[in-house]
Amino acid sequence: MKVVIVTSVRSLLDASIQFQKTACRHHCNYLSMQVVKEIEEFGTINEKNLEFDTWKDVIQNDEIDALVFYRVKQISISTGVLYESMMRNRTKPISMYFVRDCLAFDGNPPSFRMTSCNINAYNRSKIKDLIILMNMKTCNKKIIGEFIIDNFGSVDALLSIVNSNVTWVTSVINNSNGRGINIRVSNNKMLTITSFRRFVNKLKMYKTTKCASQLDNLCTEMNKMDIIDKK
């Protein structure tokens, strides 16, 4: 199957393009897809994008079997409407895959289906280690923050992995007592959802802490520049 990867950001401050590409490439490799092209967009995607030559070359090429997006929210219109617009210039059906959402869209009748999501062994191991660290009273925020950056690159990247593998992450959270030892947990669904949300909220706190630290560093550097200019 020949596919085209489509990544996009909404802000110049968003540095997630490379992570999106990596996630999509891993997904394609997992499903034995051949990536023949990668498209980068700024802003959300709609029918107007299809008017550009880059998109025309892809849409009118019946050798392309599918488009691989990072997530559904990249598209600002109905997925069905976008599909119909593409099919006006094609003789062969085209599929759309959404990596983060674990969804695929196959066209007419418009319908989504679940796809298998793969979390690699490295990420499994590091997420387990992270959960253990977060449950240890002797580990401070600095240590955990550095662990996240060293192993996942950013809090956003980690959150993307976690949100794409809710079931597996939740099972690890609920079966660990913080020392790497499995314990019996309740089958209460509400408790399971709460524990996952609590974990995600904790991760977001590290994102806020990191941003605040970066802002402090930036202000310090600007103050130094101001002092030099005055001299």
Swiss-Prot record:
InterPro entries: Poxvirus_F16
Top-rank taxon: Viruses
GO cellular component terms, A-Z: host cell nucleolus
Signals that turn on the gene: Expressed in the early phase of the viral replicative cycle.
Keywords of this entry: Early protein, Host nucleus
Subcellular localization: Host nucleus, Host nucleolus
Family per record: Belongs to the orthopoxvirus OPG058 family.
Protein name according to UniProt: Protein OPG061
Species annotation: Vaccinia virus (strain Copenhagen) (VACV)
